[in-house]
Amino acid sequence: MEGGPEQLHLGKALEEAGGGRALAEIQELALKWFMETQAPSILQNGVLPPWFHGFITRKQTEQLLRDKALGSFLIRLSDRAVGYILSYRGSDRCRHFVINQLRNRRYLVSGDTLSHSTLDELLRHYQEVQLEPFGETLAAACPRLEENDLYDAINTGLQHTNLSLKIPATEFPSMLPDKATSPRLPAKPQVSFLHKKALDMSSRSVSDEVSAEVPTRVPPIPRRSPSLLDESPAGPSDVIYTDLRKINRAQLGLGTEVWGTLRPASAGSLACSPGREPSGKLSDEDQNKPNSLGPAPSGMKPDQGSTMPYTSLGFSLPPSSETLGSQATTWRQGFLKLSHEAQSSSEASSTDTYHLVETPGLQQEARDRPDQRGSPYEQIPTCWHGTAKLSYPGVSPTYSQQSGPMDYGYEKISGTSKLPEPGNTYEQIPAAKNKDTGRVHKPDKFRRLFFTDKKHKF
């Protein structure tokens, strides 16, 4: 026996799909076949007959017919093929027969030779004729499960039915009136199996679209805590370690520069000759003076020696209100005045001989006067990198004392074993180098003597 053209076409499609085709796809094909070819002929005044149950499984069918009378039957759509299944309650068990549709659109029970034009005609036939080889006949149709006295309804425009009217009454049990106290309401249309299938498919598609449209909510990013360096220290205990390191580095660099300015003077000056101790101790009066420099050499006045600042002997200068430029100018004038006074009083002082420290300005003057070989004052060379050279050979060094710091600027010394702690936190800025400094800044005393002699001459 051969099925109808539509049934054969769908059967070939299922065979081409193979066993890998999902059950949902098979049911979709069967539903499409039923809606396009079978629904118009099955509907009775727009309503499905009570014996048609749509898509239910074999197990559900047996559970439904278990408590029914002998011969109770129903027709359902196959869940594994395109076609109908006839199920009825036999004497010992439930029996299932496949109903095929022929090319001439007639229905035939598998194993029989007699075909029928409609399913309703087929059922009436087997209510009178026994099904072979069991010898059993059909009795009454097994009704579908009704929900709250609602009946199924279907029409040809099923796909255009308003879905908003299909609201199950079981969702609102409190709103239903009591059957005993109130008159029975007119019956409402029940959602058929076709409506349910269409609703299920539409709800799946709508839920997929909604789930695709709704963005995934991302949890908010936790607020970042403020950094320690962004907060200003509120008290003396809130010390930031990076700032502390910067201060230590700045103090270390300042100490290195100060030690570099004092290193050359300490290497070449303040050196005593063997067998002689440095003469001159600070008296009580000199110690009480803030600007005292210690014992002045013989032939010098106290006010002349007091013009030298502390830095001439390598001591740190305490902070004052004067500007750094004026301090540097005063230091150079005092240094030149001390050097010229020492040269003028060389004959009067014979006990203590002082050596002049070599500077660029005095070195030029010493070259102009080469006849100072027999003078008790001699030039002491500056120590550069641990080597000392005498500008006038043949002169034995006696007692030397530093008259002032050399005008060499800053010199960085690497490899110092121990850095001294400077007593003054202010950085000393030396005066700018000038080759003609010694000649431009003449002492006021010689200038007065020079003009006085000219007056007397004229």
UniProtKB/Swiss-Prot annotation:
Taxonomic classification: Eukaryota, Metazoa, Chordata, Craniata, Vertebrata
Pfam families, sorted: SH2 (PF00017)
Stretches assigned to coiled coil: none
Keywords annotated in UniProt: SH2 domain
Protein name (record): SH2 domain-containing protein 7
Residues of the SH2 domain: 51-142
Gene3D superfamilies in UniProt: SH2 domain (3.30.505.10)
Compositional bias segments (type: Polar residues): 304-326
